[in-house]
């Protein structure tokens, strides 16, 4: 039986957002990120801090997944994960990564390329302490990216960890920590009519950031 044809033209909304004058955009990409991120937090219905994280093995085989931004500033963009997961292994073996934020409500994207380094233990401990207790226990229960025979096994392991830490604070697992992405390239993309999109590229140099524009 033939699959129904998808009319992809109908998937695209014709709604437009107010025009941004690229000439008026900040020359500081981190300040511009702050501005766009603030708008996304106000307009996105779910997970405005969600970002795609692309990693690769040393021989160039890529993998991609969504993670949550948990900190950002002049020193980079921070996320947390299980260090023994697939992405944890790839990050340890190949520090070159890419991030992508896509905010549908604003019809904007931000692409970031750079390299990662682990956060220090104090930073990881401080963030872990802000997580809900069940999320903390979940970090102990999950052997992320390892084969799992059934959901029941996972739930039993979670219950086991609940019992283990009953009546006490849950410490951060040694295999769970954070990574900081130091950006080298940041591209801001804004949707425009007739696919005449605006692309503004910042590249880091030894003395700061350069700013330029790209054809869409």
Swiss-Prot record:
Name the record gives this protein: Pyridoxine/pyridoxamine 5'-phosphate oxidase
Domain of life (superkingdom): Bacteria
Pathway: Cofactor metabolism; pyridoxal 5'-phosphate salvage; pyridoxal 5'-phosphate from pyridoxamine 5'-phosphate: step 1/1; Cofactor metabolism; pyridoxal 5'-phosphate salvage; pyridoxal 5'-phosphate from pyridoxine 5'-phosphate: step 1/1
Residue numbers binding FMN: 65-70, 80-81, 86-87, 109, 144-145, 189, 199
Cofactor: FMN
Self-association and partners: Homodimer.
Function as written in the Swiss-Prot or TrEMBL entry: Catalyzes the oxidation of either pyridoxine 5'-phosphate (PNP) or pyridoxamine 5'-phosphate (PMP) into pyridoxal 5'-phosphate (PLP).
Keyword vocabulary terms for this entry: Flavoprotein, FMN, Oxidoreductase, Pyridoxine biosynthesis
MF (Gene Ontology): FMN binding; pyridoxamine phosphate oxidase activity
GO annotation (BP), single: pyridoxine biosynthetic process
InterPro entries membership: Pyridox_Oxase, Pyridox_Oxase_CS, Pyridox_Oxase_N, Pyridoxamine_oxidase_dimer_C, Split_barrel_FMN-bd
Annotated cofactor note: Binds 1 FMN per subunit.
Cited NCBIfam families: pdxH (TIGR00558), PRK05679.1 (NF004231)
Binding site for substrate: 70, 127, 131, 135, 195-197
Chemical reaction(s) catalysed: pyridoxamine 5'-phosphate + O2 + H2O = pyridoxal 5'-phosphate + H2O2 + NH4(+); pyridoxine 5'-phosphate + O2 = pyridoxal 5'-phosphate + H2O2
Family membership noted in the UniProt record: Belongs to the pyridoxamine 5'-phosphate oxidase family.
EC number: 1.4.3.5
Uppermost EC category: oxidoreductase
């Amino acid at each position: 039986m033939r699959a129904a044809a998808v009319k992809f033209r109908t998937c695209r909304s014709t709604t437009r957002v107010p025009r941004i004058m690229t000439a008026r955009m900040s020359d500081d990409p981190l300040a511009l990120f702050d501005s766009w991120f603030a708008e996304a937090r106000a307009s996105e219905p779910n997970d405005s801090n969600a970002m795609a994280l692309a990693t690769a093995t040393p021989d160039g085989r890529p993998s991609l997944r969504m993670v949550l931004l948990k900190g950002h500033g002049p020193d980079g963009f921070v996320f947390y994960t299980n260090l023994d997961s697939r992405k944890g292994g790839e990050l340890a073996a190949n520090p070159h990564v890419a991030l992508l934020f896509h905010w549908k409500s604003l019809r904007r994207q931000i692409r970031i390329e750079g390299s990662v380094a682990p956060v220090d233990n104090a930073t990881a401990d401080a963030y872990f302490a802000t997580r809900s207790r069940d999320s903390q226990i979940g970090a102990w229960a999950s052997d992320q990216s390892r084969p799992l025979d059934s959901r029941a096994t996972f739930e039993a392991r979670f219950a086991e960890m609940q019992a283990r830490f009953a009546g006490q604070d849950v410490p951060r697992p040694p295999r769970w920590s954070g990574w900081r992405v130091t950006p080298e390239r940041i591209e801001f993309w804004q949707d425009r009519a007739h696919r005449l999109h605006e692309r503004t590229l910042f590249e880091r140099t030894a003395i700061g950031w350069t700013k330029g524009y790209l054809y869409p």
